[in-house]
């Protein structure tokens, strides 16, 4: 059984009620491959999760953009995994580079978050990736392996984890890793999983690419053997997200 193509849309801190309803309408009307070819998950801000979930076409799912590292309680401003489960939200994005950089989330903290979210029944899009300085220093795989190791040390079952490789230098900058650069890191990550988790985990875990994915570059990226989908930022707020979802047909062709 091959790895089903996965396309996530991270709306980040964007949107009004009107804008969200327009995006959902576009998604609902878009012509996309069937759900046995591609899995689609969109991640609106917390406040819009219920409305998006209730209005979105049935075969698409929603993800939260974060959740707290343990059970809820006296943690003002946080949202717990239990609350997301209670709302019927199946997915959560954890370890996004913006949270690592702006909010100081460490590899260990992200590992704890992933483990707790999984323990409560959520599926996780776990983000890893290097900065431009780290890439230029030749330490891309060291950085990505350390981030992945912090997760691997806390979990045994990878069946509900999608790994998103997002080179920080390519997020929202218009710069994009070349298909060859993306493939190189994805293949190295899969090798790391083979050695440090198991060959089965390496074979079955989807590794998706994020970082200035557009309708123009998605098909070439999707053609890479170890690129199993995308985590899309800015383009997920636009009609071109439908084109990106359709890149899944490259794999099934």
Swiss-Prot record:
InterPro entries: Aldolase_TIM, TIM_sf, TrioseP_Isoase_bac/euk, Triosephosphate_isomerase, Triosephosphate_isomerase_AS. It is found in: Cytoplasm. It catalyses: D-glyceraldehyde 3-phosphate = dihydroxyacetone phosphate. GO terms for biological process: gluconeogenesis; glyceraldehyde-3-phosphate biosynthetic process; glycerol catabolic process; glycolytic process. Pathway: Carbohydrate biosynthesis; gluconeogenesis; Carbohydrate degradation; glycolysis; D-glyceraldehyde 3-phosphate from glycerone phosphate: step 1/1. One of its GO terms (molecular function) is triose-phosphate isomerase activity. Keywords: Cytoplasm, Gluconeogenesis, Glycolysis, Isomerase. Signal peptide: none annotated. Substrate binds at residues 10, 12. Its EC number is 5.3.1.1. The active site is at 96 (electrophile), 166 (proton acceptor). Belongs to the triosephosphate isomerase family. Homodimer. In plants, there are two types of TPIS, cytosolic and plastid. This is Triosephosphate isomerase, cytosolic. It comes from Zea mays. The lineage of its organism: Eukaryota, Viridiplantae, Streptophyta, Embryophyta, Tracheophyta.
């Amino acid at each position: 059984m091959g790895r089903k193509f996965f396309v996530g849309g991270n709306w980040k801190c964007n949107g009004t009620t009107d804008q969200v309803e327009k995006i959902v309408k576009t998604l609902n009307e878009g012509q996309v491959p069937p759900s046995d070819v591609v899995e689609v998950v969109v991640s609106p801000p917390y406040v819009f999760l219920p409305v998006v979930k209730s209005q979105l076409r049935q075969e698409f799912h929603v993800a939260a953009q974060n959740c707290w590292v343990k059970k809820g309680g006296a943690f003002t401003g946080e949202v717990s995994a239990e609350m997301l489960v209670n709302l019927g939200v199946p997915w959560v994005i954890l370890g996004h580079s913006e949270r690592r950089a702006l909010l100081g989330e460490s590899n260990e903290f992200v590992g704890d978050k992933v483990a707790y979210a999984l323990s409560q029944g959520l599926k996780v899009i776990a983000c890893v990736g290097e900065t431009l300085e780290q890439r230029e220093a030749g330490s891309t795989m060291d950085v990505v392996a350390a981030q992945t190791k912090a997760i691997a040390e806390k979990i045994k079952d990878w069946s509900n984890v999608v790994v998103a490789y997002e080179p920080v230098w390519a997020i929202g900058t218009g710069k994009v890793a070349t298909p060859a650069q993306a493939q190189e890191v994805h293949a190295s990550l899969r090798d790391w999983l083979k050695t440090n988790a198991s060959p089965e985990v390496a074979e079955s875990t989807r590794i998706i690419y994020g970082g200035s994915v557009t309708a123009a570059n998605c098909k070439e990226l999707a053609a890479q053997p170890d690129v199993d989908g995308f985590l899309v930022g800015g383009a997920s707020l636009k009609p071109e997200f439908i084109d990106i979802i359709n890149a899944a047909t490259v794999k099934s062709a």
